[in-house]
Regions:
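Flavin-dependent oxidoreductase catalytic cores
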Residues: 87-434
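C-terminal auxiliary extensions adjacent to catalytic cores
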Residues: 63-101
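Helix N-terminus capping/helix-initiation residues
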Residues: 20, 60-65, 84, 142, ...
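Conserved mid-domain beta->alpha element of the FAD-binding
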Residues: 1-44
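Generic macromolecular interface patches on structured domains
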Residues: 18-21, 38, 49, 56, ...
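C-terminal domain-closing interface element
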Residues: 47-69
């Protein structure tokens, strides 16, 4: 009704204002398109909340009420403050109590509450997302990385993630990607973590991965995912399926190579510990090597590592477990997953993502970093504000796991709404930090 009335009023006004009907219709379409999409998205979010209301019935009544009020994502934390500051203040006090803050502590927004995983205590719940820099030489982080990550740590976030740090030269996405497979890499990262720990109160996490079939490509601004014009290296994946028609076809990784790469992940994990990282993350998303096993769009194997979800998860879980065993028990470890391939039932679905998250949690994951897509060029993502947060909500509230929301989250208001509603435990923000 709101959409129909507002659209009718807008069209009537334009017909009155414009000299011709065609001009009025053209302007109407341009002006209303974005607002219509926003309203449709809000309506869809609201409908889905009520359809899945059982998911939220175990929430505390305070959080359940907040979740219902903000279900459409049109009403935010600060909107509620304007409407009922007393109630929101009591809700924020409740959240502080859940975070372990004393009753006499000054009132603060959810994003400024502490969060603990194993022995790592974060001062707040804002995370700097992994952002590729393409500035390493032979995998070595240098002054650029020191300044970039040092500035992000000084900026106030509780936790800073590195860009994907690769386990081998062949496992790099581009020639500019950093690594953890040589002593020079370890020394470069140690220099960086020492700065973070001595000059800031942030923690730092190393995201570790292997490019798989998306490797041997140009640095971002020279053509994302485009193959190198020269100096290419061989790539491998779960199956011999090229990323796109322009990329080379990877070789199907053999059992011996799987064992070798798993050992490289362990070596990188040990280096990350010696380099002073507080936390590590296995990158099992976005179509890279580990992700290529999980998604049926890139895994057509007929052995024990293909077919059912349990089979497709076999090697990713072997890698994760080996890393977890090599990583100190008092330090946390997360995993990034693609919770939706955006190709319907042909790929990983949100329902499967719940099972994937549970499997990693059973292997020792302390946090599920919930991303989506980038697993196939055929994906049809539905973009918008906080567009991946519903997957974090799904996994957190149906699997009962700690999650981190990421994806087009760019305001403090977004972060507070996500946290207060119980849609995630941490919120990762990228470009706004820049």
């Amino acid at each position: 009704t709101k959409l129909a009335l507002e659209s009718a009023a807008a069209l009537a006004n334009l017909i009155h204002e414009k000299p011709t009907l065609q001009e009025a219709l053209s302007t109407y379409e341009d002006d209303r398109r974005l607002e219509v999409l926003r309203l449709q998205s809000a309506a869809r979010n609201s409908l889905e909340w009520f359809e899945q209301v059982e998911r939220y019935l175990e929430l505390d009544p305070v959080q359940l009420n907040y979740s219902m009020l903000t279900r459409s994502q049109r009403i935010s934390h600060e909107n509620l403050r304007e409407r009922d500051p007393e109630w929101l203040g009591s809700a924020e006090r409740w959240f502080m109590d859940q975070a372990g803050l004393p009753a006499e502590a000054p009132l603060r927004a959810p994003m400024f509450t502490p969060f603990k995983m194993r022995d790592m205590q974060l001062k707040n719940r804002i995370v700097v997302s992994p952002m590729a820099q393409y500035k390493a030489t032979d995998g070595i982080p240098d002054d650029w990385h020191l300044i970039h990550y040092g500035e992000r740590a000084k900026g106030g976030a509780g936790l800073v993630y590195t860009e994907m740090t690769c386990v081998s030269a062949e496992g790099r996405i581009t020639p500019g990607c950093p690594g953890l497979y040589a002593s020079e890499h370890e020394a470069g990262w140690l220099r960086l973590t020492k700065f973070v720990h001595t000059q800031t109160d942030a923690k730092i996490c190393c995201q570790i991965g292997h490019s798989g079939r998306k490797g041997s490509t140009n640095i971002g601004w020279e053509g994302m995912d485009a193959p190198l014009a020269s100096g290419n290296w061989g790539t491998m994946s779960a199956s011999a399926i090229a990323w796109s028609k322009d990329n080379a076809t990877p070789r199907e990784i053999s059992q011996a190579e799987m064992d070798q790469v798993k050992a490289e992940f362990v070596t990188a994990t040990q280096m990350a510990d010696r380099a002073g990282f507080d936390m590590i993350e296995l990158h099992a998303a976005h179509g890279y090597l580990v992700s290529s096993f999980i998604s049926p769009v890139s895994n057509t194997r007929t052995d024990a590592y293909g077919g059912s979800l349990e089979n497709r998860m076999r090697w990713p879980l072997e890698v994760f477990a080996a890393m977890r065993d090599a990583w100190p028990a008092n330090k946390p470890m997360s995993v990034r997953i693609s919770a939706n391939d955006w190709v319907g039932e042909d790929g990983v679905t949100p329902h499967e993502a719940i099972l994937i998250a549970k499997m990693f949690a059973n292997a020792g994951a302390d946090l599920i970093d919930v991303s989506a897509g980038q697993t196939t060029v055929d994906g049809q993502p539905v973009y918008g504000r906080m567009f991946q947060t519903p997957f974090s909500d799904l996994i957190r509230n149906e699997a009962g796991l700690r999650t981190m929301a990421v994806g087009n989250i760019y305001e403090a208001d977004h972060a507070n709404s996500i946290l207060m509603a119980g849609r995630a435990d941490l919120v990762a923000v990228g470009r706004p930090h820049l």
